[in-house]
């Protein structure tokens, strides 16, 4: 799952960082796991923010299975006051046994955030079908166009038991002010027949910006999600760090969430703002396995340095390192602001090859337009590879 954000507090140039207490927490009744239709162990839950301040939170999930322990973490989208944020982790390493969930850990820091102004339409168009899937509409109630929108929700049984976290099948490219767009959600097949209703609908958006710098005479690509302006990026091979000029014109602190290729570091990042070391949130994306490093930038002009890169890493100049299966299919099929090649698509899907016939792209475009789940499309492409059509 790609991580989607909306917007983070700087105190004396340090991050106000907490281990979650009663105000930001995961209720026991909203935290569980099951084996999904692919036979992999899935853990779902929801973080509640009962504080009066918006927060950016990191969730760490740990599962014991026999003599083995598995742990994953993720930085979630910002959570507004009195709101929930659903999440889901997949553990492909766990396909059997009797997994035991440990108590989840939640760390967070307070932040500021501009409203997304995307509202779910709670009317007769919000419909659940007998097979468990749901369709509905969201409306842009703001004054500016919003791009790359996803909707998250929790599903429940008729006994009000939480069953799973779900999200819309495909990212909505954009919604202009006053317009609406349809979204479709499919629960996992193993629990679909038990679904009685959906709750906690949360829209989110990814407006990350691609950046690059020279490292070892190669172009090193990374990205950042922030309304803070970052310029003059430079990689220093002596300190294995990237420096930036940061400009926050807003008279309040906002967060920056950087994403780096997984092989570029072991995760031991250090962040300095104006020479002062701060404590960032650090996690590895559950789908792409890329690193996320998030922290706040206060009002005004600042010098930022991110250190902790692996000196032995050689940038592979992959401009689209951050793509997961869904975003790769969208880009390849022409539903994005950029397109990728057949070989890049197949690489992201884990398929060896470099050629996909044009008629397959047309078919995939049709399937995406009609909200066919991404897993189904990937399986079809893999079948075409086995049949010798994809080469």
Please report, for each region that a protein language model flagged, where it lies by residue:
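Secretory targeting signatures
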Residues: 1-27, 59-61, 136, 271, ...
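Short proline/glycine- and polar residue-rich coil/turn motifs
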Residues: 77-84, 172-180, 283-288, 296-298
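C-terminal beta-strand-rich structural cap/linker in extracellular carbohydrate-active enzymes
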Residues: 92-98, 191-194, 285-313
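Asparagine-centered strand-capping/turn motif at beta-strand->loop junctions
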Residues: 47-51, 138-143, 246-248
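Short acidic/proline- and small/hydrophobic-mixed sequence motifs that coincide with surface turns
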Residues: 52-57, 145-148, 162-164
